[in-house]
């Protein structure tokens, strides 16, 4: 083998090792964000819901601070139920990694019939949460709170 070929092979191996250490990201987070934007007609950016109260964002504990935070708690619970479904219980098929089919028409969200059992369940979790977000007041004081003292 030529030295140049060895260098290319080494570079590819190093790149693959680096890629293996990148944490997996939820694939349907983008879809959920689009559902939120559909339901609220783009009035509030999706990232405003990523660090709100005790349940909106990563994790969740304690008592929800308001109705919007309860929407997030319900969404977390819904994902927990999805993880118990046999159809959602195989590698990369759970609520955070499974994508689904849906439609948005003038703020109305519809989960499509071509979703399998797991995708349909997850889609309905996201749809219900997005509708809840759209109808519930947003309190700026509950964004980026100290969850250790407030939850």
Swiss-Prot record:
GO terms for cellular component: extracellular region. InterPro entries: PLipase_A2, PLipase_A2_Asp_AS, PLipase_A2_dom, PLipase_A2_dom_sf, PLipase_A2_His_AS. Belongs to the phospholipase A2 family. Group I subfamily. D49 sub-subfamily. Its EC number is 3.1.1.4. Binds 1 Ca(2+) ion. Keywords: Calcium, Disulfide bond, Hydrolase, Lipid degradation, Lipid metabolism, Metal-binding, Secreted, Signal, Toxin. Expressed by the venom gland. Its cofactor is Ca(2+). Ca(2+) binds at residues 55, 57, 59, 76. Pfam families: Phospholip_A2_1 (PF00068). Gene3D superfamilies: Phospholipase A2 domain. PLA2 catalyzes the calcium-dependent hydrolysis of the 2-acyl groups in 3-sn-phosphoglycerides. Its main location: secreted. Disulfide bonds join 38-104, 54-151, 56-72, 71-132, 78-125, 88-118, 111-123. This is Acidic phospholipase A2 5. It catalyses: a 1,2-diacyl-sn-glycero-3-phosphocholine + H2O = a 1-acyl-sn-glycero-3-phosphocholine + a fatty acid + H(+). PANTHER family: PHOSPHOLIPASE A2, PHOSPHOLIPASE A2 FAMILY MEMBER. It is found in: Secreted. The active site is at residues 75, 126. The lineage of its organism: Eukaryota, Metazoa, Chordata, Craniata, Vertebrata. GO terms for molecular function: calcium ion binding; calcium-dependent phospholipase A2 activity; phospholipid binding; signaling receptor binding; toxin activity. It comes from the Eukaryota. It comes from Tropidechis carinatus (Australian rough-scaled snake). The keyword Hydrolase applies. Residues 1-27 form the signal peptide.
